[in-house]
Amino acid sequence: MRAVAAIYTDCPGVDWTLYFTNKGTNETPVLEQVKAVDVMVAPATNSAAVLHRLRGSMCGADDWQPFDVPLAPGAKNEFGAINGRSSADSPFFNLDWGSGGVITAVGWSGQWRGVVERNNDGSLRIQAGMQNLHVRLRPGETIRSPRILQLYWLGADQFHGCNLF
């Protein structure tokens, strides 16, 4: 596996893509459940956590409408593409823990899945990747993960993070 990453020096952001290459002479074992991002954050405060999201596009009047998902301890929110339509859900989301947050973007035009959960200890976990990945790589073959961007922000205003780029 190889990771290609960019760390932004003018804002608190990082993006990366993972590459898997079979450099052997036989097929690889099955590659599945690859999470391009699997990050745990533990905010210093135990304030309310809110996931700010956008509806996807299903050709309706509420396309791309913002909405919030409160995350109580033990709560989990799963979302993603439907039937290969990557626009059926927005791949951009902002996890807000009151004193800051992180904006995550999933760059993938196929079937993707995201999960944001709040553990009982107050920590928050963000996961995203290709849904239903189940492949073997032949010698010389390479596949890549979705490109992930994360931008961390401080303060109580969720829109502050949106304007850091």
Task: Provide a role label for each language-model segment.
Residues 32-35, 160-165:
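Composition- and surface-driven signal marking solvent-exposed, interaction-prone regions
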Residues 135-154:
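Short Pro-Gly-centered flexible turn/kink motifs
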Residues 151-163:
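Short, Lys/Arg- and Gly-enriched loop/turn segments at beta-strand edges
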Residues 1-122, 131-133:
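Polysaccharide-binding surfaces and accessory modules of carbohydrate-active proteins
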